[in-house]
Structures are given as C-alpha cells and as structure tokens.
Amino acid sequence: MQEMNQHLAQRLKGLRSELGWSLDVAARETGVSKAMLGQIERGESSPTVATLWKIATGFRVSFSSFIEPAQAVQGEVLYRAADAIRQQPAGEGMQVAPLFPYEKRFGFELFELTLLPGYQRESEPHEPGVTEHVIVISGLMEVLVEGEWRSLVQGEAVRFAADRPHGYRNLGIAPAIFHNLIHYPAARSRE
C-alpha cells in the first residue's frame, strides 16, 4: 500500500506540474477537496476507489495510471498475474488488479476486480464516450445500469456507457470476481 501511495503522490504532483494547475484548480476539475489532494500528494492519505476515479476523470487520464507506474513494454507480449498485482485501495471491500494498464495505442485498460461480500459502489459518470465491459469470472454480483440493478453470474457479461451513473455490488456471501474492460474514446487529451 505504501508503494501505491508513493506512486499516487508522484503521479498527482506530476500531472499538476505538467498542466500548471494549482491545488485549487485541481480541486475544481476533479471534485476532490484541496485538503484531500494535498494529503494524497504528501502520501498522508489512501484515497478510495471513488476518489481515484474522480481524480482520473478530472485530469482526463486512465484509472490504472494511478494504481501503478506505466510498464515499459518489451515487444508485443505482456504477461500479468492478478495475484501478484492485486491491491485493496483504502481498505475498501474491493480488490483491484490492473491486468493491462491503459496504453494509448489500444485505448483500454483491463482490471480483475474482486467484490467482497456486502460491498457496494456507485460510480459517477466517467468522461463522455467511455464504455465498460463487465465479465463475471466467479460468484454472483449486480450491476447498476440505466438506473436498474441487474444480477450477473459466472459466465455472464454486460457492456454499457460508463459516462452515466453506474455501480457494482455483491449481496452474496462469497466474493464476486469479474473482469472490467474500460474503453476510452480516441480523442483523449492527456496520458
């Protein structure tokens, strides 16, 4: 977790510097308080997944860019093991493994997400044109799409426009594991 906080602090400082944004401007663009952004930059706070999404959306960068440093790709083959990279931001009931972090040439990022029993997260809309693809690997979960919760079980999938409110929850007694492919529109301003 400490490594993630250090990376997050460096990434946030770097983006602000690159754009010439003050903490006030960053707070306005992300919807995250100036105090919280300052704590994150100093490595004093472990933000929730929801807060990380707000920051990524405000800066118009991928979510995975805040989870781990960009990987230097050696050739066209990239092997990843979810168990080796799984993290649980801010002690939430969701574990995140960025299987394929965002690369501009592909336009997407792929996560393995684990929802612990009882966990629920409703997400604010991402930037216009973002699409999510959810594929359940094991367990039972529900997805909030177009204002309605829909159950999904192992082997089922849904694709939806993520530039609208949406969410995920696990009302069961066992973890629910799914892949989430997030596709970004071609005209992204930064990355």
Per-region residue spans from a language model:
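Short acidic-glycine-tyrosine-enriched beta hairpin
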Residues: G147-A161
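DNA major-groove recognition helix of helix-turn-helix/homeodomain DNA-binding modules
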Residues: A50-S65
